[in-house]
């Protein structure tokens, strides 16, 4: 979700094949050079889809070129080796290698997003096996460009609270490091707004929790209180902390914040739930009945509708040991929730993440088209399925492109959805 940017009305068509030669990605490819084959592969594997998202989101032609150039010159060099059967560092994201595209959908229109884990070849050679040493340089470079608005203070305060220090990394044996399924500790996400970029940082404290013997929840709440000297987040944070103490089988998963002035940021706390039942979703959405206002309950009604229409299969899930892959069944992935805290707000706002891997693409598109029609989003209903079509995807049989769907609701903005593409 963008903090300050505005979005424009949707474009009611997808460029035809005859127009592909005029699209910015194709034009830039004629004169774009790269330092190595990995960067070339990322550009041609991910760039075309990013280009379509910008075009379909009615970005100005100038913004399309600006953001594609940013992707090529700033982001791609920070993605490390391109995946392809080699024994390389594996990112937590389920997109292509170290990058994942997503798109915010709301009544006002579409916003493209790029999430990635800054990395380099040294994460694969053993020099930086836990990939700790690329993110800071990436943030400095992003701050230097004119497109992005970024405040480094929260990064500087949170990085040692939620990720391994040098001393803590030395406590891990080489065998423990190599045997760790998830090594990701930080991700970045860029909301590509119509007027500029907002940057979010995601902290995954599981490694630090393991080394220090603390729970992820304890690390997160402690970190929030250390950076929140004015107590702006204390009421909402305390409400979440109290609720999480009732969940004996569920810990927090990760924390995110907007890299803006700490007084204006939002902080989100995420949990991963293996109990894949609608009753458990309802419990988390309302925080056991603590969130019972009209807005929250109307959002829950919409969530329940989507749950039924997607045909989510209920039951216990296993904790995933890898990102989802094409061909995985629709019973492999648990669900994720987050609680968004805003300065001065007494209670958080819930957001739910539907795992969609294994569900046919056409079914997902049809469910969302009908949802948009029901809730006053006719432009989205008119174009969603067409925007999804690509020459390489048959929506009737594909089951791996639309991987996750987040959902939240407020009276002010209405339904707010983000589709994560793999």
UniProtKB/Swiss-Prot annotation:
It is an enzyme of class 2 (transferase). Its EC number is 2.5.1.-. Disruption phenotype: Leads to a drastic reduction of both roquefortine C and meleagrin synthesis. Accumulates high lebels of HTD. Roquefortine prenyltransferase; part of the gene cluster that mediates the biosynthesis of the mycotoxins roquefortine C and meleagrin. The first stage is catalyzed by the dipeptide synthase roqA which condenses histidine and tryptophan to produce histidyltryptophanyldiketopiperazine (HTD). HTD is then converted to roquefortine C through two possible pathways. In the first pathway, prenyltransferase roqD transforms HTD to the intermediate roquefortine D, which is in turn converted to roquefortine C by the cytochrome P450 monooxygenase roqR. The keyword Endoplasmic reticulum does not apply. The indole alkaloid meleagrin was shown to be a good candidate to control c-Met-dependent breast cancer proliferation, migration and invasion. GO terms for molecular function: prenyltransferase activity. Dimethylallyl diphosphate binds at residues 113, 200, 202, 268, 270, 353, 416, 420. This is Roquefortine prenyltransferase roqD. It comes from Penicillium rubens (strain ATCC 28089 / DSM 1075 / NRRL 1951 / Wisconsin 54-1255). Belongs to the tryptophan dimethylallyltransferase family. Induction: Expression is decreased in presence of phenylacetic acid (PAA). It comes from the Eukaryota. Keywords: Prenyltransferase, Transferase. The gene is roqD. InterPro entries: Aro_prenylTrfase, Aro_prenylTrfase_DMATS, DMATS-type_fun. Pathway: Alkaloid biosynthesis. One of its GO terms (biological process) is alkaloid metabolic process. Substrate binds at residues 100, 204. CDD domains: PT-DMATS_CymD.
